[in-house]
Amino acid sequence: MSVACVLKRKAVLWQDSFSPHLKHHPQEPANPNMPVVLTSGTGSQAQPQPAANQALAAGTHSSPVPGSIGVAGRSQDDAMVDYFFQRQHGEQLGGGGSGGGGYNNSKHRWPTGDNIHAEHQVRSMDELNHDFQALALEGRAMGEQLLPGKKFWETDESSKDGPKGIFLGDQWRDSAWGTSDHSVSQPIMVQRRPGQSFHVNSEVNSVLSPRSESGGLGVSMVEYVLSSSPGDSCLRKGGFGPRDADSDENDKGEKKNKGTFDGDKLGDLKEEGDVMDKTNGLPVQNGIDADVKDFSRTPGNCQNSANEVDLLGPNQNGSEGLAQLTSTNGAKPVEDFSNMESQSVPLDPMEHVGMEPLQFDYSGTQVPVDSAAATVGLFDYNSQQQLFQRPNALAVQQLTAAQQQQYALAAAHQPHIGLAPAAFVPNPYIISAAPPGTDPYTAGLAAAATLGPAVVPHQYYGVTPWGVYPASLFQQQAAAAAAATNSANQQTTPQAQQGQQQVLRGGASQRPLTPNQNQQGQQTDPLVAAAAVNSALAFGQGLAAGMPGYPVLAPAAYYDQTGALVVNAGARNGLGAPVRLVAPAPVIISSSAAQAAVAAAAASANGAAGGLAGTTNGPFRPLGTQQPQPQPQQQPNNNLASSSFYGNNSLNSNSQSSSLFSQGSAQPANTSLGFGSSSSLGATLGSALGGFGTAVANSNTGSGSRRDSLTGSSDLYKRTSSSLTPIGHSFYNGLSFSSSPGPVGMPLPSQGPGHSQTPPPSLSSHGSSSSLNLGGLTNGGGRYISAAPGAEAKYRSASSASSLFSPSSTLFSSSRLRYGMSDVMPSGRSRLLEDFRNNRYPNLQLREIAGHIMEFSQDQHGSRFIQLKLERATPAERQLVFNEILQAAYQLMVDVFGNYVIQKFFEFGSLEQKLALAERIRGHVLSLALQMYGCRVIQKALEFIPSDQQNEMVRELDGHVLKCVKDQNGNHVVQKCIECVQPQSLQFIIDAFKGQVFALSTHPYGCRVIQRILEHCLPDQTLPILEELHQHTEQLVQDQYGNYVIQHVLEHGRPEDKSKIVAEIRGNVLVLSQHKFASNVVEKCVTHASRTERAVLIDEVCTMNDGPHSALYTMMKDQYANYVVQKMIDVAEPGQRKIVMHKIRPHIATLRKYTYGKHILAKLEKYYMKNGVDLGPICGPPNGII
C-alpha cells in the first residue's frame, strides 16, 4: 500500500509491507512534535532510555542497556520509504528538546521509521557524538546542495520485497515508486546531465536543484539517515559481505554489476515495475536503480550509517570511555567482519576531468598517518581499545570522512569539482598553534593504549587546503606552542585518569579537543575544560617524542543561521576538531624533534615505526611502493607496519586499499592514503602538493584524454595562467567548490572518454579558484551558495570574493589585508600582490604589505611601489620594511627587482641600516661585483657608506682586479671604486695595471677603467699609465677602444700629454682622418691642441696634395675625413679659415655629387650667410666644369 502525505510543503511517501523475519513490538503513540508520523506494520521499537540521553548531554560516560538502541529490530519496512522534502527558505528546524545536547525528537523533519515515536527515539550515544561530523550546521544556510544519505540493509532474501534504501538525493525528479503513485515535478531550469552521478555501474544523474534552497535541508536529511540506520545486527550479515548476484531479479530484470563492493548487495533499489526512465527520460537520480548505494549522489559526499560511529570496541565495557552501542544480540567479535576487508571500498567514480581514472578506495580501517610516536598500537583491532565498534562501520566512516574532507580539500581549487560542501565548516576557523607534540597522530599514538577512543579519526589530518596558510604561521606559533609546554609536562603522569577524561565537544564528533582550543579563551566551557586535561595528557605523550608544535585550523567559531559569528567551541554540534595544517614548504621540524623521531623509530622493537625514520624528520614525505597485505586477519604487533602518511601500505591487513587516489579502476589493494603507488608526490610536501605531485597517477586503466589531459607523465601546468589551472595552483590555493564535472581533473570510470573535461568558464583564473572555504561555496559572508551544476554563473561574483584572505573575508578583518604568503594565484604571485598589480588597491601602504615585503621586492611593480614609498616613508615604516629584507638581503641584492629596494636603503636608509646592509655584503663583494644586479648594489653602497666601510669593501677585490676589470659587471664596480674611494686606498688597482695598460686600453671594459684612473687618481698614480699609453699611441688611435683612451687624454690630460699625441698625429693627418677610429682622434687633436699645433695641422691639409687633387679634396669626399674638415672650418683662425674656403671653392660643383661633400657645402653656405661674404655663385655650370 502506498500513501502520499503532504504536510507544510513536505511530501512524505511511505509504503507498509510485511517483513516476517523481524520481531514485532507494540506500537507507541506518536510524538506530537513530529511533523509526519510514519507507522509500520511491523518493526522493533526501541525502549525509551532518557537516562542515556541526559548522561550524554552532561558529558558523562554511560552505557545504554541492550535494546535501547533499536538496531537489530530496525524494521525492513522503512527500507521502502522515499522522501520528497522541500523546506522554504529560512524555515528552521523544530524547537530544542531536553535530551541529547539539543537533539530532540522534534528535530527530525521526516518520519524516522520505528523510532519516530517520542518514547522510542532515544538518540544513541554514538549518534549524538558523531552525527556525521558537522551535521549540527543545519542552522546555517547550507546552500542548495543536498547531502543524500542511505543506509545499509541486511543481505537476505527479503531484498526481493522492494526498495530498501532511503534515498534523498533525487528530490526533484522521478518518484521511486513511479509517477502513478506520487509524482513530483522537476523544477524549471534544472539541467539534466547524464553521467554526472558518482556511480560505477548506473547512468544516474546528480542534479541539485536550485529549489533546494538554503535551509540546511541536506544536513537534516543525512541526520535522519544516520538516526534511523540499522545496527550491528544487520551489519553482521556482512554489509560488505558476499551476496547473490541474482537476488535482484525483480529489479526491472536488469542485473547490475556488483560494483566495487564485490558482492555487496544492499537491497533492491527500485520497486518492481518501476520504470527507469520517467517523464524526464533520465534514470532515477542518486542510483535508485543501482545496487551499490553506499556512496553519495553528489560529488564529495557519501552515505554513512548510524552505526559507523560506534565509539568503543565490541568487547569494551562502558566504564572505559563513552557509552558504546551494544547490539541486542551482544557484541560481535572482530573476526566476524574479517571477510569484509577482502573487498575494496572505492568511492563513487568521479567525472572525467582530464586525468586517468583514480579510484577512491577506502577500506575499513584507519588511514595510515605519519607520526614519530608510531610504536603504540593505535589501531589494534585485537585489543580493547578499538576506535570503532565494527570494522565495516569504520569503513563507511572512512568513506564518509575521507571522501568528503580529504578529497574535497585536495580538489577544491578546481571550479569543476562537484563537491557537496554541506558537511564542512566553511570559514569559521581560527588559525592557532597546537603545542608541541599535539599533532593528533603523534599524541594519539602515544596515548592510544589508555585513552581508548581518544584517537582522532583521520579526517582530522586531512590534507587541509594545501599551502593556503601563511608560512610565517610556523614561526609565529612557536611561542604559543612553547608556552603550553609547562602545563603539559605537569599532566603527563596521571595515566589512570585518561580513560575517564575522554571528553567530546558537545557530542559533536569522536574527535577530542586539542590544546590549541585552550589558547582561545574557551576554558569557561566545562567540556572544554575537561578536554583540556585530556588533551594535555596526549600532549605530554607527544613531548616524549620531541615533536614540535603544529599549526592547526581550530574551528573555534561558526556562523549561525543569521550569519553572526559565534565563537564558542563545544556549544555547537559538528564543529570538528582542529585540522592540522600542512606547510606550503617542507615541514619545519626542529633538529631535536627530528632526532627524537628517528630514535622513536629505531626503538620500535617490532618495527612498528620503521616507516617513520625517513619521513618524519625530513622535509620530504615520500611515497613508498605499495605492498598490499593479503591476509584478512591482522597481526596485533604489526598494526602500524607503515605509519607514513603517504605510507607504502595500510595500517593492518583489514585495510587493503585505504587510498585517497588509488591506482587503477577497482583494485582492492596497492594504495595508500596519499596517492597512487606509482604517483610521485614531488620533491617536497609543500612544493608539490598543489599539483598532486609531478605525476598525478600512472593509473592502470585508460581514460579519455583531452588537449590538457593530466596523465601520469604530463606536466600539470601546461595551461597558461590566464586559464584556470588544472589542479596546479590549487598548489597553495584556497578551496572553493562547485559541482561542475568531476573532482580535481579525475576521469571517472563511469564516464566515457568523450565526457566533457572543460572547466566551466565562470570560475576561471581569479574566481573562486583562489578562495579558501572548508565548507564549500560561500558568498564571502559565511553563507552557502549553490554548488549545483550550472549554478556557478549565478554566484560568479560571490564566489570570487570568498577568499580566506580577501578584504571581504569573514575570517580576517579587511582593515589589515591579511593574505597568506602561500595563497598563491595561478600566476605564482600571492593574492595580495596579484590584486595590487591589478590596481585593486591603489592606496596600498607599506604597513599593509607586512609579511609580503620580500615578495613585493622581487616583483617589478611591487619593487617600484616599495621604492617610491621608501623615499617618503617614516623611519618606522622604513624599519618595518628593513626588518623583513635584512635576513634575505643577499637574495634581494642579486634579484632583478629586489636590488633596487636594497639600493633605496643605501640611499634613504638610516646609517644603522646602511651599515647593517654593508655587513651583509661583507665577504660577498667579489661575487656580487661579478653579478648583474649585485654589482649595482655594490656601486650604490660605495656611494653612501662611510669611508671605513668603503675601504673594507674594496680590499676584498685585491687580487681580483683584472678579473673584475674585464667583466661586464665587475668593471662598473672597479670604476665606482675609483670614483668614490680615496685614491690612496686604490694603489692595488694601479699596481695591477702595470704592464697591462695597452691590453686594458684595447679592452671593451678595461678602456673605461683606464679613463676613470686618468680622471680620479693622483698624478703619481697616473704617470705610469700615461707612459704606457704614449708608447702605443699609434696603435691605440686606430683601435676601436684604444682611441677613446687617447681622446680622453686629449680632453682631460695635461698639455704635455696632449702635445705628445699631436706630435704622433702630425704628418699622418690625411691617412688617420680617413680611418674610422683615428679620425675621431684627429678631430680631438684639432679641437684641443694649442693654436700653434692646430694651425700646423690645418696647414698640412691645405698644402698637401693627394695625387692630382689636394688632400683637402680627398678628405671632403671621405665618409670619415669630411668631419675633420668641418671641424677645421669651425675651429680655424679667421685668416686660416679664409684660406680653407678658397681651397674648397673650386670643388663646389664636384662636391654636390658626393653624399659627404654635401656636408661641406652646407657648412660653407652657413658660414657665408652668417658673415655676409660673397664668393660668387655657389652653383657652377650645369656640366660641372669650372
UniProtKB/Swiss-Prot annotation:
Gene source species: Pongo abelii
Domain notes: The pumilio repeats mediate the association with RNA by packing together to form a right-handed superhelix that approximates a half donut. RNA-binding occurs on the concave side of the surface. PUM1 is composed of 8 pumilio repeats of 36 residues; each repeat binds a single nucleotide in its RNA target. Residues at positions 12 and 16 of the pumilio repeat bind each RNA base via hydrogen bonding or van der Waals contacts with the Watson-Crick edge, while the amino acid at position 13 makes a stacking interaction.
Location within or outside the cell: Cytoplasm; Cytoplasm, P-body; Cytoplasmic granule
InterPro entries hit by this protein: ARM-like (IPR011989), ARM-type_fold (IPR016024), PUM-HD (IPR033133), Pumilio_RNA-bd (IPR033712), Pumilio_RNA-bd_rpt (IPR001313)
Region of interest (Guanine-nucleotide binding in RNA target), residue spans: 1079-1083, 1080-1083
Reported modifications of this chain: Phosphorylation at Ser-714 promotes RNA-binding activity. Following growth factor stimulation phosphorylated at Ser-714, promoting binding to the 3'-UTR of CDKN1B/p27 mRNA.
Biased amino acid composition, Polar residues: 511-524
Modified residues (Phosphoserine): 19, 75, 98, 106, 124, 159, 197, 209, 229, 305, 709, 714, 806, 822
Basic and acidic residues bias locations: 250-272
Function field: Sequence-specific RNA-binding protein that acts as a post-transcriptional repressor by binding the 3'-UTR of mRNA targets. Binds to an RNA consensus sequence, the Pumilio Response Element (PRE), 5'-UGUANAUA-3', that is related to the Nanos Response Element (NRE). Mediates post-transcriptional repression of transcripts via different mechanisms: acts via direct recruitment of the CCR4-POP2-NOT deadenylase leading to translational inhibition and mRNA degradation. Also mediates deadenylation-independent repression by promoting accessibility of miRNAs.
Keyword Cytoplasm: yes
Descriptive protein name: Pumilio homolog 1
Keywords (A to Z) from UniProt: Acetylation, Cytoplasm, Differentiation, Methylation, Phosphoprotein, Repeat, RNA-binding, Spermatogenesis, Translation regulation
Superkingdom in the source lineage: Eukaryota
